Amino acid sequence: MIKSWTKKWFLILFLMASCFGHLVATTGEKYFKMANQALKRGDYHRAVAFYKRSCNLRMGVGCTSLGSMYEYGDGVDQNISKAVFYYRRGCNLRNHLACASLGSMYEDGDGVQKDFPKAIYYYRRGCHLKGGVSCGSLGFMYFNGTGVKQNYAKALSFSKYACSLNYGISCNFVGYMYKSAKGVEKDLKKALANFKRGCHLKDGASCVSLGYLYEAGMDVKQNEEQALNLYKKGCSLKEGSGCHNVAVMYYTGKGAPKDLEKATSYYKKGCALGFSGSCKVLEVIGKESDNLQDDAQNDTQDSVQ
C-alpha cells in the first residue's frame, strides 16, 4: 500500500526530474517538456493538451502525468476512469510509476473495486521495470499477507531490492525487519545501515528510526544530540513521529536545554502531520497549560510500530 500523499509526491518529484533530465529531441518529448512548463505556470488547459499529445506519441511518462492529474483532480475535474485509462496506457509503455499507481488503486480500492490479484499484477510489472515503489509495495503485501500467503523471506527480498532502487521507505522497512527480527535473525548493524540509507534518500521515517538507535544507544554510542538532529530531519521530511520526538526531547531536556515553548511547537507539528501521540499531549496542554502531564504518550516513539 502506498499512502496517497506519498504516492502523489513521489510522482511529482519523478515527473519533475524527467523534465530536467537529458531528453532526446523527439516530438513526444518536446510536448512533454511543454506540458511541464505549462503546468509550472498554472496553465492546466495547455498542460493537459500537451500531455495528451506526448502520450499519443507513446511517451509513457506523459500518460502517467495525465493519470495523476485526473486521479487527484489537479487542474482538471477528478475522473478516476480517465486516471485508470492513462495509467494503464503508461504502464503498457513501460513507465513503472504508472504500474505502481494502478497497483495502489486496486490494492486500496481508491476509486475502483478493491482487487488484490490486479494490484499484485501491476506491482509485479512495475517491479520488473525496476520501479522501487512497486517492489516495495510487493514487499509490504508479502509481509502482511495481503492478497498473498504471508512470506517474510519474499517481503525482505522485495524490500531489499526496492531499497537498492533508492526507494527510501523500503530501506526503513528492511531496517525494521532486522531490528525486530521479523523473519530474519536480529541484526542491529544491518538495521543501522538500512536506516542510514533511507535517511540519506530523504525518507523521514528512516531518519526517525536512526535517531531512535542513537538515543537508545543500540549498536552505536548513545548520542542524544545526534538523535535530536535526526528527529528534526525526520520532522522536516513530514514524518510526524519525528516532530513528536523533538518535542519530547525539548520537554525533558534531552539532547538540548529544556524549552517548553519549542516542545509545544513541535507537538503541534506532529499533530498536524497526523501523529496521534502529539495530539493527545496537546489536549493535556490545553487542559493544564501550567502542568504538562507526563503520560505514556510523552515518550519518544520509534517510526515503525
Swiss-Prot record:
It is an enzyme of class 3 (hydrolase). One of its GO terms (cellular component) is extracellular region. Keywords: Antibiotic resistance, Disulfide bond, Hydrolase, Repeat, Secreted, Signal, TPR repeat. PROSITE patterns: PROKAR_LIPOPROTEIN. Pfam families: Sel1 (PF08238). Residues 1-27 form the signal peptide. InterPro entries: HcpB-like (IPR040239), Sel1-like (IPR006597), TPR-like_helical_dom_sf (IPR011990). GO terms for molecular function: beta-lactamase activity. GO terms for biological process: response to antibiotic. Gene3D superfamilies: Tetratricopeptide repeat domain (1.25.40.10). Its EC number is 3.5.2.6. Disulfide bonds join 55-63, 91-99, 127-135, 163-171, 199-207, 235-243, 271-279. TPR repeats lie at residues 28-61, 96-133, 168-205, 240-277. It catalyses: a beta-lactam + H2O = a substituted beta-amino acid. It is found in: Secreted. It comes from the Bacteria. May hydrolyze 6-aminopenicillinic acid and 7-aminocephalosporanic acid (ACA) derivatives. Binds to penicillin. Belongs to the hcp beta-lactamase family. This is Putative beta-lactamase HcpD.
